[in-house]
């Protein structure tokens, strides 16, 4: 932004970094593409080639959704400003209601995961290890996961895209809030799994039980429809989400 300002002045122009300088005209914002990876370069938001990798994929997707649900106000505060409040909600900007868009594929996978029984979903074999009862997750195509431009926090194939930050801000605040929320949620996930293991559950069964509970609890934050619609504002209020600008 500093470079843009200097260069524009050099050519007798000015850069408008205001989120909504003109009423009725599209405003400006920033999209933060966010993912997580291991020290070996493995993207934790990419489905793997086997069922074990897919369980890892589901684990990190579900915990991210859970973090957005539990710390919704923190994420909203990280992008809040008077000028951004004028931008959010119309003309290609995401709404002020923070929700997650997953797309049909991932939503169906999570619904199936939630509704399956432990016995149906997990088989533990001494030689082969963990098996998931549902088939291998198909290759995720950008076209199938990135259609909803009205979502402020959308899954886009191998990452999440946080679309709410304004054009004049440093994205560090939004990323700090998101990283902190997900990190804290992963710590809680570990505690919940270990608590079930202490009761005698195997690690695989404990992970599955915790994920099922998280999927059910965080459902109010999931929305794949039109974020601009009045129906969504009413539905979001019923779900207990923050609907204020």
Model-derived features: positions:
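Secondary-structure boundary elements
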Residues: 5-14
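Acidic, glycine-enriched catalytic cores built around paired aspartates
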Residues: 7, 21-22, 51, 56, ...
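Acidic/histidine-rich catalytic neighborhood
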Residues: 28-59, 63, 96-100
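An acidic- and aromatic-residue-enriched active-site/binding cleft used to recognize and process polar
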Residues: 13, 18-24, 30-31, 37-41, ...
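Structured core elements
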Residues: 14-16, 26, 33-35, 44, ...
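Active-site acidic/histidine clusters and adjacent loop/turn architecture
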Residues: 1
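Aromatic/hydrophobic pocket-lining residues that form π-stacking "cages" and hydrophobic walls in ligand
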Residues: 4, 64
């Amino acid at each position: 932004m500093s470079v843009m300002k200097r260069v524009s002045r050099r050519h007798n122009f000015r850069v408008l970094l205001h989120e909504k300088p003109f009423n009725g005209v599209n405003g400006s914002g920033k999209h933060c593409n966010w993912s997580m990876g291991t020290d070996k370069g493995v993207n934790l938001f990419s489905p793997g080639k086997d069922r074990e990798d897919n369980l890892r994929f589901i684990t990190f997707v579900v915990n991210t959704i859970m973090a957005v649900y539990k710390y919704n106000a923190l994420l909203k505060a990280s992008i809040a400003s008077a000028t951004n409040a004028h931008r959010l909600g119309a003309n290609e900007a995401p709404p002020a209601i923070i929700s997650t868009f997953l797309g049909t594929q991932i939503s169906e996978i999570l619904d199936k995961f939630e509704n399956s029984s432990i016995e149906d979903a997990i088989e533990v074999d001494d030689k082969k290890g963990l098996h998931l009862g549902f088939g291998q997750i198909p290759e995720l195509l950008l076209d199938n996961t990135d259609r909803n431009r009205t979502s402020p926090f959308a899954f886009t194939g191998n990452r999440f895209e946080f679309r709410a930050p304004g054009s004049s801000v440093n994205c560090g605040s939004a990323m700090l809030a998101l990283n902190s929320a997900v990190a804290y949620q992963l710590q809680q996930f570990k505690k919940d799994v270990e608590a079930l293991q202490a009761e005698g559950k195997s690690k695989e069964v404990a992970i599955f039980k915790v994920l099922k509970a998280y999927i059910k609890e965080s459902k109010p934050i999931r929305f794949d429809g039109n974020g601009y619609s009045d129906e969504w504002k009413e539905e979001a209020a019923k779900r207990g989400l923050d609907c204020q600008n």
